[in-house]
């Protein structure tokens, strides 16, 4: 997940989401790694004070199996800039992550295995990632994913494979696109060139086409079939823009066809339908090979932003056949003037109507002790600990922390120590 704020059966279910979201948009800057969101005038008040530096009384976890995960983005395992790109060097880097995360009380790693339409494993669908080989398409001579799963399990930790489903290239990364990349194969094929969509300097798979959705789903199934992962997770990157030019040809063709039998869906309704079709297909393909693997999504915490990106989170949380868990990225604190953390947690709890869908809360370790959000993250050193308490009171099923690197920085040291006390109480 580069850092972002929040980065069906009928598409009309978006009406339910809008009602619950109360048109709230978080007015918070989340840095260069996750997307920013627009603010709304709705200003619910927090019921939690975070002004005190005192250690707070922990709320007990409702289950001994509470999720305590940390995201490991591709930057944390990037070997492309390392002088030593060997298998031994990679394993040493990842072993340090496993031992460090376990020491911090984590029980699950969410690791980037397909950041740019590529693979940190041997794939029949996607080229080798430049993250491990230095250049996309170059075989590193070993299987990073196989080792990471084995290393995590040896330490008693679960491993979830993290996928960016649509992103292929952004801001010149990766700098070289492999010859066996679907982008290379499709861009010069008149019948397939629209399967790739462009937004600014980014290139993306276009989920309007069933063939593209099948490719993404087959890629997820490949992981489920070939590796002993405990889960597979999509990030929040779906449609990167609301600009109708992004998929104009596909939508125009749909509209012409749909007009013959009635009124076409709006662009946003249609896009949400495309993403729902993708999510449902991925879910079914994973379950077809291993029903025990969890499939989850980590959408932005702002529901309106999710809708704008084509993410019909209300349907995913209420209808069978989409996800096993949802983990909104609630990267706000209790002082947020638009959406305090506790209000956001309660809103998401209300969205989860399918009792088989687990609710995890994504927490912003990276903001702890920083100047983010007008310095409000410096007002207390127990914000994360209080957020865990709120999550437990809200009956959520666990937490995911962004990100691994920030569990070990001086900036976040006191916050991490305090939240560990609550997690391990």
Name these PLM-found stretches:
Residues 25-45:
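Sec-dependent signal peptide cleavage junction
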Residues 64-91, 161, 166-222, 226:
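Active-site-adjacent "subsite" loops/lids of carbohydrate-active enzymes
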């Amino acid at each position: 997940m580069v850092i972002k704020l929040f980065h069906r059966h009928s598409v009309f279910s978006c009406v339910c989401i809008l009602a619950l979201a109360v048109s709230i948009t978080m007015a918070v800057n989340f840095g260069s790694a996750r997307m920013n969101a627009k603010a709304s005038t709705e200003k619910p008040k927090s019921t939690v004070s975070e002004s005190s530096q005192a250690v707070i009384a922990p709320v007990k976890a409702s289950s001994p199996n509470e999720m305590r995960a940390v995201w490991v983005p591709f930057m944390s395992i990037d070997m492309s800039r390392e002088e030593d790109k060997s298998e031994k060097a990679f394993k040493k880097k990842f072993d340090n992550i496993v031992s460090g995360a376990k020491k911090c009380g984590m029980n699950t790693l969410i690791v980037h295995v397909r950041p740019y339409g590529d693979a940190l494993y041997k794939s029949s669908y996607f080229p080798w990632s430049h993250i491990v080989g230095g250049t996309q398409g170059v075989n590193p001579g070993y299987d990073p994913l196989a080792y990471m799963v084995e290393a995590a399990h040896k330490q008693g930790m679960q491993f979830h494979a993290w996928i960016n489903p649509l992103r292929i290239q952004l801001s010149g990364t990766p700098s070289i696109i492999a010859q066996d990349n679907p982008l290379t194969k499709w861009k010069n094929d008149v019948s397939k060139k629209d399967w790739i969509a462009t937004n600014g300097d980014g290139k993306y798979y276009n989920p309007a086409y069933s063939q593209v959705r099948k490719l993404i789903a087959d890629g997820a199934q490949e992981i489920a079939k070939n590796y002993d992962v405990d889960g597979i997770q999509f990030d929040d990157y779906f449609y990167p823009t609301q600009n109708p030019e992004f998929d104009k040809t596909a939508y125009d063709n749909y509209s012409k066809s749909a007009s013959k039998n009635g009124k076409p869906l709006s662009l946003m309704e249609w896009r949400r339908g495309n993403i729902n079709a993708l999510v449902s297909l991925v879910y079914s393909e994973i379950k077809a090979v291993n029903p025990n693997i969890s499939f989850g999504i980590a959408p932005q915490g702002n529901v309106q932003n999710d809708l704008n990106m084509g993410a019909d989170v209300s349907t995913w949380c209420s209808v069978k056949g989409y996800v096993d868990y949802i983990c909104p990225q609630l990267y706000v604190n209790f002082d947020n003037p638009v959406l305090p953390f506790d209000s956001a947690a309660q809103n998401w709890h209300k969205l989860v109507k399918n009792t088989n869908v687990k609710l995890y809360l994504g927490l912003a370790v990276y903001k702890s002790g920083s100047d983010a959000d007008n310095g409000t993250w410096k007002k207390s050193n127990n914000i994360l600990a209080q957020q865990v308490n709120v999550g437990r009171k809200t009956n959520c099923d666990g937490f995911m922390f962004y990100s691994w690197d920030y569990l070990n920085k001086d900036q976040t040291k006191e916050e991490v120590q305090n939240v560990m006390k609550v997690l391990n109480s």
